[in-house]
Amino acid sequence: MNFTEMLQNLTGKPLADCTDQELYLALLEIVRQKSADRVQPVTGRKLYYISAEFLIGKLLSNNLINLGLYDEAREALAAAGKNLSDIEEVEPEPSLGNGGLGRLAACFLDSLATLNLPGDGVGLRYHFGLFHQSFEDGIQNEKPDPWLTAHSWAEKTDVTYPVELAGKEYTARLYKLAVTGYEGRTNTLNLFDLDTIDESIVHDGIAFDKTAIDKNLTLFLYPDDSDEAGRRLRVYQQYLMVSAGAQLILAESAARGCNYHDLADYAAIQINDTHPSMVIPELIRLLGEKGIAFKEAVKIVTKTCAYTNHTILAEALEKWPRAYLDAVVPQLMPIIEKLDELARTRTKDESLAIIDKDDRVHMAHMDIHFTHSTNGVAALHTEILKNSELHGFYELYPEKFNNKTNGITFRRWLLECDPRLTAELEQRIGSGFRKDAAELEKLLAFADDEAVLGELTAVKKANKEALADWLLRTQNVKVNTKAVFDIQSKRLHEYKRQQLNLLYLIHKYYEIKAGHLPAAPLVSIFGAKAAPAYIIAKDIIHALLTLSKVIAADPEVSKWLQIVFIENYNVTAAEKLIPACDLSEQISLASKEASGTGNMKFMLNGALTLGTMDGANVEISQQVGEENIYIFGQTSDQVIHRYDAGDYIAAQWYEGDANIRRAIDFLTGEEMLAAGHAENLTRLHDELIHKDWFQTLPDFNAYVVRKDQALSDYACDPMGWRRKCLVNIAKAGMFSSDRTIAEYDRDIWHLGK
């Protein structure tokens, strides 16, 4: 039966007479059937990747590509006068993640299935995700981001598990979402929910009764933690995830012959950041119910579990007040106390304790003590963990520490989102890179081929025009496609330093007003959400939106400079932005970004990186060579030294540098105050002068010089720019998540064995 016949059988009428919605549902059903055919029996050890987030993006096209059906589907629809891209618009994007943590988890699931490794995800079925972002009068507003429909990819099962929270029993319902690999197997993303969730309790944006646990528990990812009820709700969420997940793991392992004593021969559990940390005491508790003594249970769990650290930011290393855990998970506290006592027999260093003198429970400490592996996610990040942030643990357990540099799935971030570049690459080097990303290096043979460089430029031009069309259609913004597309799209956080980009744009505004024109017109595009309670982050958004209005109203400046801020940035938007990018902004304060994966996606699609020596930027620089990347700013050692010395005083930089002072003072100048809100702008102005915790000002001048150099190279040396782009594409192979997952399996998981 051909594809057209399959679709007609499901719709019951000619394709030309079907709506896009009807065709979407038919395609969804075909994908489900074909995915089921690729499910393979599990032998040996199986991975359970537990994560609070899975930012999976829309699934239709990705699944069609991985199943080898994309071209067939597109042609069958085109023959009936239908456009697959229109049908893709019908699909809601799953609201299951927010930033890099969740996107990494999604890439890892793709690579596990592609490499034919048995590995499932475990998480929660959020109804509204983080939030839907909109801008009103230059201010971020948050609303629910619904995505669940009667025909969701996540299928309801009859499997339930009891979960005890604050002395009350809840019933966790399992939903299963098929994860297809590229020419590989089908694995599963297991998502848990409660049948009692009530979406109607949400009001006034994203406000809801945080104490109505039976109604609210899975409504939102990362509920607002600015009050105690919100913080406790996060503990409730985390325990629901790990308790239901642990019961699933034990049930599936037992069904395959596990007697619980040999759990580590059947299951490998990866704890993705600290949100799932309670799986350690929960598994010990459940094994105790199976008759296994505490000491043996600890050994079993330690051998089964591994931990990935994603941050050196103290605020992100979760420390829960003991009172919260006593209230929400009293059944775990005796176990956590025993684990703390056991850890104290291994070291007298109080700073490595699980329960500290202030009665806070350190989740990362529990992870490191009672898993067999702790990994960082980029070479620099891992070295900082070993030598600085987690040095005491490294001295205690040197054998546990290892690095696994993050990666991205090339199926979504090249084949799906940049079909023009994919076709050009296949024409030049064949299609082997689809499965073996290292084959991209073959492109280096064309580094001096003007015809090939010209084709790559034509691809970029077409992608920029496609983005311009999308921006006009979805954001009501018109952009100059001949300008440099300079993009910073990532979570809004001071350490990622969108405020540094802001100050550059103000500086450039002044330069243009003074007649010093840039080498090329610049369109600066931002995509970012700020956490609802993160005031300064929301002020940065307001400042950028206000500056965009000031520039747009100035005909002298707007010919050369434009700011675009994407509303509700998500995976779908990223798939539009990344192929069109010329200059990729990766400007976090050195030592603060664990890895980053946006840098890899932009590089793969032929953008050049403007960045600090932070996270995976270091390894990108090593791969492409310093002549093919724009590096600036302090080193991580210099930054750490400043923090240790405590001698950074932002006001001294403000007073001592006229350009810095002019840019900061513009925030509260006449033009900005006329277009924006004094409260937000003044608060950001004062923050930069009196605090600037992430050292924006010391890097400002170096940033201006390197960014101006990039614009000059783009305008004055187009052939050199094109060559740099080609080298970046060719050297991106190392950053495939297939490589990352193969290393995890080789060193930590040993799946299927």
Enumerate the predicted regions with their spans.
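A conserved ligand/cofactor-binding region detector
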Residues: 1-753
